[in-house]
């Protein structure tokens, strides 16, 4: 099946139409007896193989139904094909069905994985191709539809009345025109002759100006205007025909309502029974799964507690991660300083400078020692000189004291 390059907005619903046609063709082949009764399967719904969010789906059941119907259709075409089982490999089943379809002349231009879901456009396409081949092998031919004859007597009467009404209107308008032309009509021949005479003359040298009086023109228009109105007379038969049609439609609606009322009541009863079954099944499932629900609630509460503990632990981990980042930053700084100091220690230039400085210090110390020795020697000589002077002065003082006593 070749994919369309441009798909219109109605292509979404084409699958529903294809499925309905497929179901009608399966009913023609009497699939209820040969497939449903044989495998103990419930009848298909109108949109069973349609893939849509508005239709309930069961991929496992739909794929099994697809494989069983496809196998039955292949056997109807005269090809031997074993009925697939639920435990068979889906890939092998799909591959066998597509190979048989190609053998029968069908076109397959999509991957086999499209059929594993059991629903969708490709599933409907494969089944439709197989059912067409089966109908062809059975020699089945569709008859032309027979359309019921429709009574059109009322419409014919209405059309005849309409034609009569229009003919009357035309006759009345013709009579009014003739009377108007006889009484107040214009002399068209004289006007035509005058116009031709003016056109045949030479072209005027100046622009012509109209000499018509506007007031007289308006009076003439007001006088002629009532005679130009067309009045269409209403036909009294129209509303009676419409009333008869309304009564006929009402009778048809009442008849159809009586026929459909029984089906609607039956449908309501079926829906009520189905709802009761669903509610009872729901209650049964609730009672069976009550302990699992309680366990689930306990597990949910434990999960919430574990989440709280995890959040607390994650908060501590975040704080420790921040501290670790700060310590790592400080460690990087220390490593950088150590590398700088190591590089400076491995360099010999500072050592040479230190040695030169030590040598210079030794020389300066020697010079200072010499200066200190000179200063000490000078100081010692000064002290000795001062001591000698003091001694001399003391001897002189002792010698002067006896002489003074003698006097």
From Swiss-Prot:
InterPro entries assigned: Intra-flagellar_transport_57
Matching Pfam families: IFT57
Domain of life: Eukaryota
Segments for region (pDED): 313-404
Phenotype caused by lack of the gene: Fishes show ciliary defects. In retina, cilia are generated but not maintained, producing the absence of photoreceptor outer segments. A loss of cilia also occurs in auditory hair cells and olfactory sensory neurons. In all 3 sense organs, cilia defects are followed by degeneration of sensory cells.
Entry's family note: Belongs to the IFT57 family.
Role this protein plays: Required for the formation of cilia. Essential for differentiation and survival of sensory neurons. May also have pro-apoptotic function.
Annotated PANTHER family: IFT57/HIPPI, INTRAFLAGELLAR TRANSPORT PROTEIN 57 HOMOLOG
Protein name: Intraflagellar transport protein 57 homolog
Classification lineage: Eukaryota, Metazoa, Chordata, Craniata, Vertebrata
Gene giving rise to this polypeptide: ift57
């Amino acid at each position: 099946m070749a994919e369309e390059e441009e798909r219109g907005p109605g292509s979404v619903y084409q699958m529903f139409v294809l499925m309905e046609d497929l179901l009608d063709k399966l009913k023609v082949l009497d699939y209820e007896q040969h497939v449903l009764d044989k495998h103990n399967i419930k009848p298909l719904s109108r949109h069973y193989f349609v893939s849509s969010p508005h239709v309930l789906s069961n991929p496992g059941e739909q794929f099994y139904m697809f494989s069983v119907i496809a196998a039955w259709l292949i056997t109807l075409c005269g090809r031997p094909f074993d009925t697939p089982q639920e435990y068979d490999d889906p890939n092998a089943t799909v591959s066998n069905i597509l190979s048989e379809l190609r053998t029968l002349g069908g076109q397959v231009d999509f991957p086999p994985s499209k059929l594993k879901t059991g629903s969708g456009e490709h599933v409907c396409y494969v089944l439709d191709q197989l059912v067409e081949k089966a109908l062809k092998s059975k020699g089945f031919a569709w008859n032309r539809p027979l359309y019921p004859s429709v009574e059109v007597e009322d419409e014919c009467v209405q059309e005849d009345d309409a034609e009569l009404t229009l003919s009357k209107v035309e006759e009345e308008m013709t009579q009014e025109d003739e009377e108007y032309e006889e009484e107040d009509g214009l002399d068209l021949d004289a006007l035509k002759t005058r116009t031709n005479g003016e056109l045949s003359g030479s072209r005027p040298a100046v622009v012509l100006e109209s000499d018509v009086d506007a007031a007289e023109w308006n009076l003439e228009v007001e006088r002629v205007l009532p005679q130009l109105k067309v009045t269409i007379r209403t036909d009294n038969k129209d509303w009676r025909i419409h009333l008869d049609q309304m009564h006929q439609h009402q009778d048809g609606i009442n008849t159809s309502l009586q026929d459909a009322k029984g089906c609607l009541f039956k449908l309501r009863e079926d829906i009520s029974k189905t709802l009761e079954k669903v509610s009872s099944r729901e209650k049964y499932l609730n009672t069976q799964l009550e302990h699992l629900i309680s366990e689930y609630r306990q597990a949910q509460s434990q999960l919430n507690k574990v989440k709280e503990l995890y959040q607390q632990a994650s908060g501590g981990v975040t704080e420790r991660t921040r501290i670790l980042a700060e310590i790592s930053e400080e460690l990087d700084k220390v490593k950088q300083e150590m590398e700088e100091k190591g590089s400076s220690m491995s360099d010999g230039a500072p050592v040479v400078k230190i040695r030169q400085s030590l040598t210079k210090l030794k020389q300066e110390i020697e010079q200072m020692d010499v200066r200190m020795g000179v200063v000490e020697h000078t100081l010692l000589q000064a002290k000795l000189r001062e001591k000698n002077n003091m001694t001399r002065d003391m001897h002189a003082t002792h010698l002067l004291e006896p002489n003074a006593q003698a006097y």
